[in-house]
């Protein structure tokens, strides 16, 4: 068997696509998606909310490319890390010493959106990238990279 490369935890909600409001999940839907105990053998922990830094060191704008869009018409999750990598200073990117990361998704990113990528170093042990919609100013995601 291969080496474990990544684990993940998430909280899920059911959203009405028309109203964009959270809805109560039906028993029928719960029954359709049962846990697989053999695949949940890592320590569970409560998800904590990442906070937006008070100040930033740099900002770039990026227009979302069609190739980054998944079948749900949202930006694929891997590209959140790609955007974070694009804003990091070159010496940090070259050092390649990120040991862990967290992503807090707040709002979907879609094709053609212009995203402002903000970079901060709030601690000596991490970097934080905040992704905001340039038009609305809404936070789309906060990414924390640990060194």
Predicted regions and their residues:
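HotDog/MaoC-like acyl-thioester-processing domains
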Residues: 1-48, 109-111, 121-147
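Intrinsic-disorder/low-complexity, polar/charged segments enriched in Ser/Thr/Lys/Arg/Asp/Glu/Gln
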Residues: 7, 54-61, 100, 114-116, ...
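Generic anion/oxyanion-binding catalytic loop in active/binding sites
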Residues: 9, 69, 101
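Generic structural detector for well-ordered beta-strands
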Residues: 11-13, 61-65, 104, 146
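Hot-dog-fold acyl-thioester-processing enzymes
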Residues: 16-97
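Intrinsically disordered, low-complexity segments enriched in small/polar residues
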Residues: 78, 103, 116-117, 125, ...
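Active-site beta-strand->loop segment that positions catalytic residues and contacts the acyl thioester
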Residues: 100-121
């Amino acid at each position: 068997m291969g080496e474990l490369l990544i684990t993940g935890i998430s909280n899920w909600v059911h959203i009405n696509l028309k109203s964009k409001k959270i809805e109560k999940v039906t028993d029928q839907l719960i029954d359709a998606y049962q846990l697989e105990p053999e695949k949940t053998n890592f320590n569970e922990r409560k998800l904590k909310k990442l906070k937006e830094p008070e100040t930033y060191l740099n900002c770039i704008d990026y227009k979302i490319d069609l190739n980054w869009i998944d079948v749900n018409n949202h930006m694929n999750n891997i590209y959140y890390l790609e955007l974070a990598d694009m804003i990091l200073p070159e010496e940090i990117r070259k050092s390649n010493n990120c040991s862990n990361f967290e992503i807090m998704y707040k709002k979907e990113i879609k094709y053609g959106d212009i995203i402002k990528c903000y970079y901060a170093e709030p601690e000596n042990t991490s970097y934080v990238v905040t992704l905001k919609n340039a038009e609305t100013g809404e936070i789309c995601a906060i990414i924390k990279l640990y060194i």
